[in-house]
Amino acid sequence: MTQYFDGVITDSAGRGTVSPNVICLHEQDNGIGWKHTNWRTGRAVVTRNRELVIQFIITLANYEYIFAYKFNQSGGIVVETRATGIVSVVNIDPGKTSDYGNVVSPGALAQNHQHIFAVRIDPAIDGDHNTVLEETSHRVPMNPETNPNGNFYEIRQNIIRESQWLDAAPQQIGRAHV
C-alpha cells in the first residue's frame, strides 16, 4: 500500500506553503533477506528482504530529482538520489566537437556538468538517547599466525558526538554510517 502526505515547501524568503500529497511512503522488495538449502533434503527456504521508503520528487529546471530515504530491516538508513529529465543543450556547429561537453545530436551539445547533493540527518528520532557511528573497514597486515592469507580486516567504530560533516562518497570504500 502506498500512502501520500502533505509537505511544506519554502520560498526564497523562508515562507512555507503546504503542498498536498507530495511525500510518498511505501514498502518495497529489497532482494533476498536470507536463504538456506538443507543439504540433506535438498529443500530451500528463502525469505525476502523488505524496506520502508519515504520518497519525494522535485522539479528544478529540466531535471526531476528523486530523493528516497530507505529504512531496512536491520536498522540501516540509505539515502538515495536519482536524476531524470532532459539534458540541457546548446548549439554547436555541425562537425565540431568540444572539450566542454558531448555532441548528442548534430548541432546539439550537452555541456559537462555535475549534480551535488547535501543531506542533513537528525538522529534524534524518538529522543536523544541514540548513537551515530561511523564504521570503517581496515585491512590487517599479513601475519603467519593471525592472517596468513591476507584476507582479515577489522571494523573500527568512531562515535559521532556532535554535529559535523561526514564524507559518504561512494569512493570511500569500506565506510558506513550507522
Q: Which residues fall in each region the model found?
A:
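Beta-strand/loop-rich accessory regions of lumenal/periplasmic or secreted enzymes
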Residues: 1-177
